Amino acid sequence: MASRLLHRLRHALASDGPGEAAAGPEAEQFPESSELEDDDAEGLSSRLSGTLSFTSAEDDPDDEDEDDEAGLDSPPSGDGASGEDAERSPPPDGQRSSQLLARQLQDFWKKSRNTLVPQRLLFEVTSANVVKDPPSKYVLYTLAVMGPGPPDRQPAQISRRYSDFERLHRNLQRQFRGPMSAISFPRKRLRRNFTAETIARRSRAFEQFLGHLQAVPELRQAPDLQDFFVLPELRRAQSLTCTGLYREALALWANAWQLQTQLGTPSGPDRPLLTLAGLAVCHQELEDPGEARACSEKALQLLGDKRPHPFLAPFLEAHVRLSWRLGLDKRQSEAQLQALQEAGLTSTPPPSLKELLIKEVLD
């Protein structure tokens, strides 16, 4: 589409140049400007803004999308032009104008990606498995959650079933009728729920559904959306930690921390601290005191100078103990912990991070 657009613009520029014949009756009846405004401009703006559609693969193949975007990135060279194009090629001034216009289109496209579509998360269904858990049977969709950062960084992942997505959609519809009215969601089916075609279409629909939610600030900050991403991971990580499966729990805590970092909005006042507590406990139990201390230090930075928090004394105690074990300075944390104890704001000794994890109720 972009190549056709540039092709028409070249002829429009050429027609203004000297020695070019006047446009015939057919050109007057169907001026190129009207075609551009009515058809191509709308399609171009939708592609530039990154708008997602729920069209099927037959109607809107991914290959065509990639070709169109490539056409905007790299204008077609004259080597590939047909004989007819060569006969109608504009004079050098027209070529320069066309190249300038192509550069302007590229700049507009790049600017549109930065302004119309702010940096946000991308979602990709990497696998979809049919799970048989008698008497129920369902499809478990695993999504990669990708955000800004080093390209070699492993993306965070979540695994959800249709009922999880449906519950999120229903809750958001109840709270945000206006914004949600423009967001589509795949309907329930009475039959053929486990065919490859249905699973593929739903996978694409779920990717777009989450992408649209992330594009609306009001929805992006909704507690229900935060819970959808983070809460199941935290519950599983907490359960594994309490049963002593620290290596398995560590992977879930790390994934939950990455999700919260990428979401960029608070997923609850205590959840980042709880996640850091889980990471610190698992690293400590797996004989990695350096990482455990780093997690405690990060938590103390998050707590800052706020009023005493239930997690403050346990993190201070862990930081003092780990610093002593590593031969690092512990005086500041030690003095702060002693001040809390003298003020009667915590017990002596304070509860451990593991005790807090066991007692914490995630809802």
From Swiss-Prot:
It is a peripheral membrane protein. Residues 57-71 have a biased composition (Acidic residues). Residues 1-11 have a biased composition (Basic residues). Residues 46-56 have a biased composition (Polar residues). One of its GO terms (cellular component) is early endosome membrane. Changing residue 161 to Q: Abolishes location on endosome membranes. Abolishes binding to membranes enriched in phosphatidylinositol 3-phosphate. No significant effect on binding to membranes enriched in phosphatidylinositol 4,5-bisphosphate. Residues 119-236 form the PX domain. The keyword Transport applies. A 1,2-diacyl-sn-glycero-3-phospho-(1D-myo-inositol-3-phosphate) binds at residues 161, 163, 188, 202. Residues 12-28 have a biased composition (Low complexity). GO terms for biological process: protein transport. It comes from the Eukaryota. The keyword tRNA-binding does not apply. Belongs to the sorting nexin family. Binds to membranes enriched in phosphatidylinositol 3-phosphate (PtdIns(P3)) and phosphatidylinositol 4,5-bisphosphate. May be involved in several stages of intracellular trafficking. PANTHER family: SORTING NEXIN 20, 21, SORTING NEXIN-21. Monomer. This is Sorting nexin-21.
